[in-house]
Amino acid sequence: MKQSKRYLVIVIGGGHAGTEAALASARMGVSTLLISHNIETLGQMSCNPAIGGIGKGHLVKEIDAMGGIMAHTIDKSGIQFRTLNASKGSAVRATRAQADRILYKSEIRYALENQDNLSLFQQSVDDLIIKGDQIKGVVTQMGLALMADKVILTSGTFLGGIIHIGQRNFQGGRAGDAPSNALSRKLRSYDLGVNRLKTGTPPRLDGRTLDYSLMQVQSGDIPLPTFSFIGVKEEHPRQIPCYITHTNKRTHDLIRSGLKDSPIFTGNIESIGPRYCPSIEDKVVRFNERDSHQIFVEPEGLSTNEVYPNGVSTSLSYKVQLDFINSIKGFENAQIIRPGYAIEYDFFDPRGLKQTLEVKKISGLYFAGQINGTTGYEEAAAQGLLAGVNAACAILEKDAWLPKRDESYIGVMVDDLITKGTNEPYRMFTSRAEYRLLLREDNADERLTPKAKELGLISEARWQSFQVKYNAVEQEKKRLKNTWIQANDTQANTILNQNISHEYSLFELLKRPKVDYQILSKIESGKPFLTDITLMRVIENQIKYAGYIKRQLVEIEKYRKNENTVLSTNINYNSIKALSTEVRQKLELHKPETIGQASRIQGVTPASISILLVYLKTRIS
């Protein structure tokens, strides 16, 4: 049976990648269908109830700068906000928020249902309609054919999902949801480089059975930060604390005694899990010299007693889970509401994707999220946004959006994935970016919002707000340059705790390491200073890091001369005999789109790149 209504874009999956993909496509004016196995789980936080963190917060800011929904949603559902690395440089400072997962999901659902050009449909997708090498649509569980020009697959952990608790395992996309086995089989019939990964989650606890008086209180920041550039702290719901406790020697002994039933250590699970989010049993074995590991006790929301003990992800048997949980300070009488588990699932080699996240071998099919080997809500959402934008661009015959490594963390992530691939769940960190001083949280809108305007992703009101903000920044910088402090100014010397030996502008004073905008504002200048903390930080960072940023821009310009040189997919690398056999094989396998991508393939040396450039010049001449 074929449905008569035709959509231009179909998005499969309603998680963090799927929702951003569908909203982006629809915002660009393209008729879009989001199809999910269960509409009640749209925007579900399957694991930890939090958004942001080091590197991840940067992605959320970039998604927001491009008109995405994640930042706005967490501003309306976040029950604790903190700035991480606050004492470090601005490049690595990051926002993190604890979420009320019920509120979060509700806000996502509201955004989806009220977006023009977007329809929702509840069904599992069992098959793809592919003719030749071109996607034509999808087939649902009930045999309904839905036709589309582009399809974006955001399957999360559902493809061939198997859940493990001790020696028991069963099929599932996550606890309580069926897997997508039929779709997994369909994709496996194509040569797309399928492999398996695993992730895990801790047991959820009944907060009424915990003794918080035995734990350390962890409060949020004051003043409260916001994620969205147009967000206001008044949008935040009631704020509540988190808590910290620790495992102990007895906890670790109980875990060791239960390893005989661990699917990880008995070989039932062979897939690789997240390096930076290991299970508690993995931590106990790998760091056997330690008698304690930190646990963040995180509330799941304002209207539930459920608690998420961050740091004890596990797939041990239920009995061992309960025993080791009850050995932890404050958890002595804890009751488990949901057991922890590990889940294995299919992912596909992201080196088989174009920079747009379109599958190289199947035109019009895009992959986003965990299907590409990433882990985390933020990484998934960023890929969904990119895939949604580029699917719409292809429909509208616009140039694709291809963010570069020096423009965004989204660009860093996609470039890493499509050039290097991954054999473990990929997580974003600031350390992955070469130019992280340019890729700060505070300037994500400056970097990306003009592109969002060009693509039709933001409203005119949002664009006006952006222009007002940066006009104010430029006006204030101009004022600081034209406001002078005289030599030996007594008030300035006292406030700055240093002698001003000759005349300085406020602009020059702000370059000093121990002088920030708020200190400067105490000096009598005869004119008002800004009171908006966001604008203060932007101005501070632009002035303080101007010299370093200038040097990085010079480096980038040199690099870009060859970075964007296009490599035709028709090049026969085996014919370039000056290249080593290894390099020829790798270039043939990956078919990089640019010299920059080729240079980041493992084993491709700078000498090989020089040979390629000579080859291209010879070919042109």
UniProtKB/Swiss-Prot annotation:
Keywords annotated in UniProt: Cytoplasm, FAD, Flavoprotein, NAD, tRNA processing
SUPFAM superfamilies: FAD/NAD(P)-binding domain
One GO CC annotation: cytosol
GO molecular function list: flavin adenine dinucleotide binding
InterPro entries: FAD/NAD-bd_sf, GIDA_C_N, MnmG, MnmG-rel, MnmG-rel_CS, MnmG_C, MnmG_C_subdom, MnmG_C_subdom_sf
Subcellular location, record wording: Cytoplasm
Residues reported in the UniProt entry to bind FAD: G13, G14, G15, H16, A17, G18, V125, S180, Q370
Pfam families in the cross-refs: GIDA, GIDA_C_1st, SAM_GIDA_C
Residues reported in the UniProt entry to bind NAD(+): 273-287
Main location: cytoplasm
Cofactor(s) the record lists: FAD
GO biological process: tRNA methylation; tRNA wobble uridine modification
Highest taxon listed in the record's lineage: Bacteria
Quaternary structure and interacting proteins, as annotated: Homodimer. Heterotetramer of two MnmE and two MnmG subunits.
Entry's family note: Belongs to the MnmG family.
Function: NAD-binding protein involved in the addition of a carboxymethylaminomethyl (cmnm) group at the wobble position (U34) of certain tRNAs, forming tRNA-cmnm(5)s(2)U34.
Protein name: tRNA uridine 5-carboxymethylaminomethyl modification enzyme MnmG
